[in-house]
Each structure stands twice: as structure tokens, then as C-alpha cells.
Amino acid sequence: VLVHLAAAGVSERGDGNLEEILEVNVIKSLKLLLNALSNKCKNFLIVSTSSEYGKNTFDTKTLSKKSKINPFTNYGISKAIFSNLLNELSKNYNCKIRLMKLFPVYGKGEHSNRLLPSLRRAAKRGKNFIVKNPSEIRDFTSVDYVSKVLIDASNFKKRKFKNFQIYHISENNPITVEEFAKKYWKIYKTKGRLILKNRRRLYTRHVSNKSSVWKVS
């Protein structure tokens, strides 16, 4: 089984250089799979993102693995292109591709500019922290849980399928960004305070329905 996690352009905004993002997320990733196929590897576990659903996250309460993809960030666009190519590749080469779409992940090793590391840094310095999207609802999922799911999903004897299969990786416990921030702000016992902005603004909802989530067995 080849497990593919490589990605460029992963950030809070997902709007890095499109050419560079496509080079890694589509062109080089496709070459990797073709090389593996030429060496008789037929099982692939590919990690993607809920950002593929894009604009649908504005008006859909929960996302299904059958939801239409409609990305609007460069990162989301690149991953959607690659996912579509994977579907065709699985049929043309009669291989098995299991696509795992990650919902918002936090924990050890994440980029220093993301929400939790930024919040932790401000808390340790005793400074105030601005939450710009407090009303946004996300399926916050710990990296430890993601690891358990990927190990379990790499067993292709589970949930057998013919060529192409999609599942979500999510702890399925949606909360607002405000609730998430307050939880960790309290843990860090900081002297600073949280400043909440744009509370009435329309935000995306990165929330999976229960039936689309891979359950560890």
C-alpha cells in the first residue's frame, strides 16, 4: 500500500502560488502513482481535504462523501483536480484508490501560523489574541486521531471495494472556532484575553455527516 500525504499550499487561507501548488499536488503526485503502478503497486491510500467542497461549505450543514466538490482556494482546487484524476486512474489501471478527506486538523507538528499554535504563543506571552472567525463551525480533529484512522484505513481487507472509494477523517464533534479557542485559552491560564471579531459574518462549515466518516475498527 502506498500512502500519499504530500501537499503544498496548506494554510488557513489556502491561497499560495497556484503554479507551485499544482506542481506538487497534481503533476508530481500523479508521477509518483504512475511510477508505483509500473512497479506493480495496486493499492493506494491518498489523503485529501474537505477544502475540495469549497463553496458548498457555506450553505451545507453537513458534508457527505457524495457532496459535490466546488473549491475556491488554490489548495482546494489542486486537491480536487488530483482527486478527479485518481478516479479515472483507478478505472484505467484497475487499481484500488481509497481517498481520505481530512477535516480541520490540529496538534503536534502543525504550522506555527495556524490557529492553535498562534493562540498558544500569545497565551504564553500573556498577550491578547484576536479570533477573526469566531462563529465558524469546524470538525476539529486531533492529529493523533488522524494517525489512528490512516493506519486502520491502510488495511485494504476492510470495507472492500472495486476501484475508487471516499471517506472522511473527522472526530465528528463540531464546535465553533470561539468554543475551541476558549477551551485552550482556559487551559493555558493566560493573563491576556480573547478578542472576538466578525461574529455576524457568514462562514464556511467544515462538518462531516456521520455516515461518511471512517470508523476505526
Regions found by a protein language model. Name each.
Residues 30-74:
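Conserved Rossmann-fold NAD(P)-dependent oxidoreductase catalytic core, especially the SDR/UDP-sugar
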